[in-house]
């Protein structure tokens, strides 16, 4: 079945950089950022899910639920469109039933262009758009997340489902995918690899968020399978996102005990970078958030990025967290925006750090921030009332 490409393309906000491919800021070395123009600033590939959220009430005691549309790969596209004004698209599975209608409406409302491989629902069993169940926790009570991904349409996606030469031939500056989609099935991982090859052939930057999810990988062969799949994909990327735990669990990199280290100490992460670039010489930039969890609603928050032998660390802020889900995707979006806009490594990391923090102050998985709020926080702004 041929994919459906639909939805308006919004005009992008003017980037800071000028025309012509350029290195993404001082210290980011050989990461050549395509100039503005073309059809899309970013194309994401991944599954889209419905998250049912009872707030701070444990799920088993809930009487009401908020519905969020989410997905690690989709969230990045949604954040870049809604907050940063970039032209983005999501290549994903769509099911022709009312849940699909809800998801489609939310995708378009965020300003993201949908590119669908459509599936017909049989009225009883599926295929389905996956459901994620969560409660936010509170104080000393941690958040809880579990899934129903039975007969998930996104897991049926396979090479050949999308016309990558046509999509990238219209000029896409950045391609993004992640470990959550890669974990769904053998065919979903193969589809990412197919898209990455097409992206490179067209001159797009390729990024991968490791986003290791043990519960999902357990259904697809566990860590050994993750190492095999994610290792193949990491070999094809320019920008790798993930902390030291992701590097160990998803890629099998040896490293110090994550539990024993401070969440704010970048040394464990930076100490593993030499291994990363030795094993994956194509990787030019690696970045992650750093956090120390004091309680469910109070975190110390920082971030670190490495590019071509240079590392930068964001300041540490005390962050009041409303809904933790989506903060990492908010970080990824801020980083990509900064790099596409011609920012240097430190400025791009600051934008990522600021936007990721802001996303955790809203309900749901995607941004409600404005670019002005992100820039203000990145510069060291405060929560004083704006009049």
Residues covered by each model-derived region:
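Conserved N-terminal subdomain of the carbohydrate kinase-like
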Residues: 87-179, 374-387
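Catalytic-core regions built around general acid/base machinery
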Residues: 190-203, 228-236
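Alpha-helix C-terminal capping segments
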Residues: 68, 76-87, 109, 338-341
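Short catalytic helix/loop segments, enriched in acidic residues and glycine
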Residues: 58-78
